[in-house]
Amino acid sequence: MGLPWYRVHTVVLNDPGRLIAVHLMHTSLVSGWAGSMAFYELALFDPSDPILNPMWRQGMFVLPFMTRIGITQSWSNWSISGDSVVNPGIWSYEGVAASHIILSGLLFMAAIWHWVYWDLELFIDKRTMFPVLDLPKIFGIHLLLSGILCFGFGAFHVTGLFGPGIWVSDPYGLTGKVQQISPAWGADGFDPFNPGGVASHHIAAGILGIIAGLFHLSVRPSQRLYDALKMGNIETVLSSSIAAVFWAAFVVAGTMWYGSAATPIELFGPTRYQWDQGYFQQEIERRVQANIDNGNSIDKAWSLIPEKLAFYDYIGNNPAKGGLFRVGAMNSGDGIAVGWLGHPIFKDKLGNELFVRRMPTFFETFPVLLVDENGIVKADIPFRRAESKYSIEQVGVSATFYGGELNNATFTDPATVKKYARRAQLGEIFEFDRTTLKSDGVFRSSPRAWFTFGHLIFALLFFFGHIWHGARTLFRQVFAGIDPDLDEQIEFGTFLKLGDTSTRRQSV
């Protein structure tokens, strides 16, 4: 037929059998990719250190999504939670991956069958003997089935009635585990960080979908509405489907980037706003002060800070820090975190405490400034030493570590103090292994940023696709120059198929 690449989809116009075939093949490809990608990630994933080397530092993309809906165990006898593993069966990382690949194969064969046996009696209207799809009825069927699935996920899987529950954690990402969730039916259910809203919203949306599906199965649209919205044209279905997809993509891009109960930081990494607002820094300071108030010494107070919490307070884990087009996992940048060196407290020669000003997210370099409790600069690393007034040497700055591997160690050598002052710009100070992965020292982004970027781009493209196909289907007669008074009962284009001489052009 010699179709250009952007017109090839016309071969399934008014061809219900092959329309089903291409959708089966598409689903097969998606399912096959998901299963294959899961196996690929499992081959690379190192589960040995969930605190300093979590899945999001290793660049895992599909594993966090599997984990958040209750999969925590592997056939290789490891568990995300560190618990003992006893025959996890199909509800494991490998089990789910294999299930997707098997499903992909079945869908592949089904697609081939429907492509070969496209001319089924099922698609022929007995009254007209023409192939037909009752699109309003199909819409009702899809609404009903998706409503049942949505309701079932919220009412059974999330609540643990028949399923494991979902991943739930505290606000600081320290105690995450899979647990059963009770639906939140009050105003608190609208809090995006309340996991109870995940259950209640799926239940409510599922019930709404079931009711809407039954409505569209039992109530036919009026002729005027049917014609106005071109309900007999498959391109109408394409346009409205694209609208649903781009809207969903915009929503999940927002919940991922800004954070929500469905995107826990233990699985996807922190958000950039937690660095910008000093979220973890403030919690660490609060805990240290509480420990001191309870009678602990300052070194003991810092030693009680969880290493996991300290690691979140490091700019290298900021998803906006890595740049979108730097290939590789976070570990390929600054390396694999080995241990927390501790929290450095800087003081001048008079004993006044100084604080290193932290680097903002979008700076690649930033002056090293040490300020007092009032925010006044008292020391720095000067650009031009000849004009320096506040250099580390002149002010006599020392650094003492509390907590971590350098607990109670004090450094007065200016070169060493400068080194730790520079590193303190980036948050808590950690030791990294840059040899194992040949890490290059350039920050990488986390799966949180990749997911957000990808879904925003696709949402934008699909938005234009919705406008394009919506305009084509609503104004097809206008674009084609067809007489608006044509007395054909179906709109032009329903039976328009290239090379099909039986397509009706006028009323019988």
Swiss-Prot record:
Which Pfam family, an example, fits this chain?
Answer: PSII
Q: Which GO terms describe its molecular function?
A: chlorophyll binding; electron transporter, transferring electrons within the cyclic electron transport pathway of photosynthesis activity
What is the predominant subcellular site recorded for this chain? plastid
TM segments? 21-36, 101-115, 140-156, 203-218, 237-252, 457-472
Q: Name one GO cellular component term.
A: photosystem II
Keyword hit for Thylakoid: yes
Cofactor-binding details, from the entry: Binds multiple chlorophylls. PSII binds additional chlorophylls, carotenoids and specific lipids.
Q: Is Transmembrane given among the entry's keywords?
A: yes
Annotated GO biological processes are: photosynthetic electron transport in photosystem II
Question: What's the name of the protein?
Answer: Photosystem II CP47 reaction center protein
